[in-house]
Amino acid sequence: MTVEYLPVGVKCNLKCTYCYQEPMRDAGNFSVPLNFVRVKDSIIKSGGKFALFGGEPLLATMEHLETVLAFGTEIGNHNGLQTNGLLVNPDHVDLFKKHKVHVGVSIDGPGLCNSARSSDFDTELIISNIVGMLQEGISVSLIITVHALNAMHMRDLLFFIDDMEKAGVRFFNFHNLEVDNHLTDFTLKLSDTENFRAFATIYWHTKRKDIDCLPFKDIRSLLTVEKPYVSCIWSGCDPITTPAVQGINAEGSLTNCGRTNKLGIDWIKSNNYPSMERYQALAITPYAKGGCKDCEYFFACKGQCPGTAIDGDWRNRTKDCVFWYSLIDMIRGDLVDDGVPVLDLKEANQRFLRSIYAPPSRQQTQHSDTPHGDYHGDHTDFTSNASQPPK
């Protein structure tokens, strides 16, 4: 588990069309760095691993960023930060080098591919900042959310991936679009078939490259390893406690993962042991009723992230079920064609079902203590250029 520290809460300098944090901003849930002493105490109590997140963490003052990263260096943290990349300046670069910060940048490609996030001018500046950080020896990874705009300009996106690889990026996380508002639904949402076609194109384009790409790497692990090291969306997340995320706001209070926060209210984080109740229910609920009963890939998908559930109700499976099933099935077929041994689907499902009905202290998800979002998952998305989890 990794702690996400939000030094400016969910404040951001951009207004991305599809941002899942918008309900929190609409509800007025902003905070400022008022009590870093309390924040440090919360980080230590949570295990001492943390990354800076937002909103946009680079809205914090240089003084505060220095204090936070120096604290991370002091306790032996793998310092990391997730940013949109627009505000990066030479002082930030010096700070990142000083404290060995792994920087994750959220960008959906060049030009029109990224127009749901920023203007063409800002996108060019972000790309320049990425290249500049890489040239200074800073480890950079990318989150690329796949949607109608970059799917429409897929050739530009693939060239961008190639350019970023040549510049030194070794870790890419291709996100499935989370649809939480009408504008996203109307302008960016892909059909299941279109979404599958876009991800499949990226899969085949990157397959032979010397880079790590999610979700493809995770899916291969889920299909070939009994206890794989995978990111949070594959872990059977409890939406009440979100065990992969111990968010800490600027006042030092613990919060849950923002992806399940559909009302914009940061409820006080539960101290309860994570429950597998959602997955016990999905396992026995028919497909027509929003469940996953008898799905051959339930052990791998687990109904996916509760933040993407049908009707925003985490009791349901993901609304993107057809897309994920198709992608998993394609990758399984490719593994078989390549002669890679894959798990027996029936046995894998039986193992997973046994695990979710075990006593809480013996329940096992496939999260393997993955620092949330990274190395390399769904939120914080920085990496150390290593393909293995951090020690």
Where do the PLM segments sit?
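Radical SAM/AdoMet-radical enzyme domain recognition
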Residues: R25, F36-A51, A60-V179, T184-S191
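Cys/His-rich metal-chelating microdomains
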Residues: K15, C19-E22, T260, F298, ...
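Canonical Radical SAM [4Fe-4S] cluster-binding loop centered on the CxxxCxxC motif
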Residues: M1-L34
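C-terminal accessory region of radical SAM enzymes
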Residues: E194-P228, S253-G303
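Short, basic/aromatic recognition patches
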Residues: E226-G236
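Radical SAM enzyme core and accessory elements
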Residues: Y287-K391
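Short, acidic, Ser/Thr-enriched surface-loop or helix-capping motifs
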Residues: I248-E251
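Short, small/polar residue-rich loop motifs at catalytic or cofactor-binding pockets
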Residues: S235-P243
